[in-house]
């Protein structure tokens, strides 16, 4: 009698479409599905894959980070492409002239980019502008930037751990004695 094949782990876990029911996002997916199929550029495949992603995997990109990345050598006169949101950064004093394509741009970031003489494209305009992704720079925000990542890692309280504990309150009596000071048992 043969051993049956174990089928419980042979499902490939990856998105084939966005979870969102947003009709405008679905239209973009239709467009980039076509482009990914009909053009031989990896750019369109990457954009399509990122359109499927969950919101936590499409973190917002700040204006300052985008400016820093676009100042790198060889990136002059290129379009910054962000499959996500571009947010304003008040720490930036002057914004250079930028050409940007994003799913969303917050109102303050939008006004600052346009005031600097920049241009903001949507993804359907980008598809007409550069269908193969020529002259573009794909950027994304920091995925590990969310506060929740501070709680991940080595258990808090163990040596050399910088993991943030989940604490009810940040008061004097909460996780401040044993393991935090030498007079109370030990100090890590």
From Swiss-Prot:
**Could you tell me one molecular function GO term of this UniProt entry?**
structural constituent of ribosome
Q: Which residues carry this modification: Phosphothreonine?
A: 158
Any one cellular-component term (Gene Ontology): cytosol
Instruction: Give the compositionally biased regions (Basic residues).
Output: 161-171, 178-188
Report keywords, A-Z.
Cytoplasm, Diamond-Blackfan anemia, Disease variant, Endoplasmic reticulum, Isopeptide bond, Phosphoprotein, Ribonucleoprotein, Ribosomal protein, Ubl conjugation
Q: Where is this cross-link: Glycyl lysine isopeptide (Lys-Gly) (interchain with G-Cter in SUMO2)?
A: 119, 164
Region listing for Disordered, in residue ranges: 151-188
Its localization reads: Cytoplasm, Cytosol; Cytoplasm; Rough endoplasmic reticulum
Q: What is its main location?
A: cytoplasm
Indicate the family of this protein.
Belongs to the eukaryotic ribosomal protein eL18 family.
Q: Which disease appears in this protein's record?
A: Diamond-Blackfan anemia 18: A form of Diamond-Blackfan anemia, a congenital non-regenerative hypoplastic anemia that usually presents early in infancy. Diamond-Blackfan anemia is characterized by a moderate to severe macrocytic anemia, erythroblastopenia, and an increased risk of malignancy. 30 to 40% of Diamond-Blackfan anemia patients present with short stature and congenital anomalies, the most frequent being craniofacial (Pierre-Robin syndrome and cleft palate), thumb and urogenital anomalies. DBA18 inheritance is autosomal dominant.
The record describes its quaternary structure and partners as:
Component of the large ribosomal subunit.
Q: What function is annotated for this protein?
A: Component of the large ribosomal subunit. The ribosome is a large ribonucleoprotein complex responsible for the synthesis of proteins in the cell.
**Mind telling me what this protein is named?**
Large ribosomal subunit protein eL18
């Amino acid at each position: 009698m043969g051993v049956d094949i174990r089928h419980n782990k042979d499902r490939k876990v990856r998105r084939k479409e966005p979870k969102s029911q947003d009709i405008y996002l679905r239209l973009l997916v239709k467009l980039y599905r076509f482009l990914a199929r009909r053009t031989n550029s990896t750019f369109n495949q990457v954009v399509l894959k990122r359109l499927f992603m969950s919101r936590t995997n499409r973190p917002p990109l700040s204006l300052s980070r985008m400016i820093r990345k676009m100042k790198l050598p060889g990136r002059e006169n290129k379009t910054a492409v962000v499959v996500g949101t571009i947010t304003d950064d008040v720490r930036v004093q002057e914004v250079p002239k930028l050409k940007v394509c994003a799913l969303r741009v917050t109102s303050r970031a939008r006004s600052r980019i346009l005031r600097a003489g920049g241009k903001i494209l949507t993804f359907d305009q980008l598809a007409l502008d550069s269908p193969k992704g020529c002259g573009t720079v794909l950027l994304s925000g920091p995925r590990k930037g969310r506060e929740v990542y501070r709680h991940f890692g080595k258990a808090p309280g163990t040596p050399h751990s910088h993991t943030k504990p989940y604490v009810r309150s940040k008061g004097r009596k909460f996780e401040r004695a044993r393991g935090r000071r030498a007079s109370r048992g030990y100090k890590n």
